[in-house]
């Protein structure tokens, strides 16, 4: 019966096991050959002393190529110097598929490679244990998100990704051919989430792709990303901030508990964030930046440099709240007594924005005026606006970038490292 490398323990000494995997490395010392076999769970040492294995197996081991796929059946022995404290003395080795040489990428990471080179040969890059660890952790992150939101009473939904209207206005849209009509890839599930509040769902969440034709080509931008979105009725921005910070804390706790081995591969030690996360207003963030030499005119978005200065002072996870109404989308609710300020927030990790959210405008007339104030035509939002005429409850929500959450949690230098096959301004293949 097949076992994974991580399941082979010293206390199994004398037992016969079968393993499948890739040849990570071969060391030929003449009368002694070592093969490191790698599967998705780790690496185990296959030891072939000439005197204790068959001539056929020994001969095969000497000529086997790295990254070939093999099956090994043999006896478990204790060996403190070997990975995991065990080795396998094989009675048989079968080459299931031989790899070509030379390899397009060095899986052992002895030879460093630029990220672009790694992405060009992504299938090979993904074999690296450190890279696999990122995606095992990502799997746990998404599982924890679903479990937490389901426990909180949210209903998972899936909204259209082909739309006829820009969610947030602007030109960051990918046009597509949709029979005889003009259509776009959706920037966000925002409009549909809000319509579902009018439908009486009260609490919804979606985990799905978003598409933004942004010109930015930075270490934190993607043109296709996975967004974790919620919308919640009968609450305000403070209510959904509470959900967000508890969700993030739960994700950290679950990853720390269930992904200890993969965190070890990445040499990452997770610190569980404490609740509540610190909160500062937009004005306070401007003051911090100004004190450190970066002046931001009121009403403008905070520059990258300003956010870095604020992040240096705040550290870790924190909220920036009460943004200028004009800097947020048309659906953000302004304060009644200060209409120039919106009931909105961004969740930051250092200088990196992870999430953006707000209480939404739920009053039809106010929403129409807000759309007009942004220079858009209410007629373009017909299906959306109709939902506000027949009993739309007060509601709030947010969108959280899955890749940015993982990037910041693991200290990755580039958000593309958290995506299997990233899409950016210059990359459409693989």
UniProtKB/Swiss-Prot annotation:
Signal peptide: none annotated. Binds 3 Mg(2+) cations per subunit. The strongest magnesium site (Mg1) is bound to the beta- and gamma-phosphates of ATP and four water molecules complete its coordination sphere. Its cofactor is Mg(2+). Its EC number is 6.1.1.23. One of its GO terms (biological process) is aspartyl-tRNA aminoacylation. GO terms for cellular component: aminoacyl-tRNA synthetase multienzyme complex; cytosol. The record marks 83 as: Important for tRNA non-discrimination. It catalyses: tRNA(Asx) + L-aspartate + ATP = L-aspartyl-tRNA(Asx) + AMP + diphosphate. The keyword Nucleotide-binding applies. Mg(2+) 2 binds at residues 353, 356. Mg(2+) 3 binds at residue 353. ATP binds at residues 212-214, 220-222, 353, 401-404. L-aspartate binds at residues 168, 212, 356, 360. Residues 190-193 are annotated as: Aspartate. GO terms for molecular function: aspartate-tRNA ligase activity; aspartate-tRNA(Asn) ligase activity; ATP binding; magnesium ion binding; RNA binding. Keywords: Aminoacyl-tRNA synthetase, ATP-binding, Cytoplasm, Ligase, Magnesium, Metal-binding, Nucleotide-binding, Protein biosynthesis. InterPro entries: Aa-tRNA-synt_II (IPR004364), aa-tRNA-synth_II (IPR006195), aa-tRNA-synth_II/BPL/LPL (IPR045864), Asp-tRNA_synthase_2 (IPR004523), Asp/Asn-tRNA-synth_IIb (IPR002312), NA-bd_OB-fold (IPR012340), NA-bd_OB_tRNA (IPR004365). It is found in: Cytoplasm. PANTHER family: ASPARTATE--TRNA LIGASE, CYTOPLASMIC (PTHR43450:SF1), ASPARTYL-TRNA SYNTHETASE (PTHR43450). Homodimer. Belongs to the class-II aminoacyl-tRNA synthetase family. Type 2 subfamily. NCBIfam families: aspS_nondisc, PRK05159.1. Aspartyl-tRNA synthetase with relaxed tRNA specificity since it is able to aspartylate not only its cognate tRNA(Asp) but also tRNA(Asn). Reaction proceeds in two steps: L-aspartate is first activated by ATP to form Asp-AMP and then transferred to the acceptor end of tRNA(Asp/Asn). This is Aspartate--tRNA(Asp/Asn) ligase.
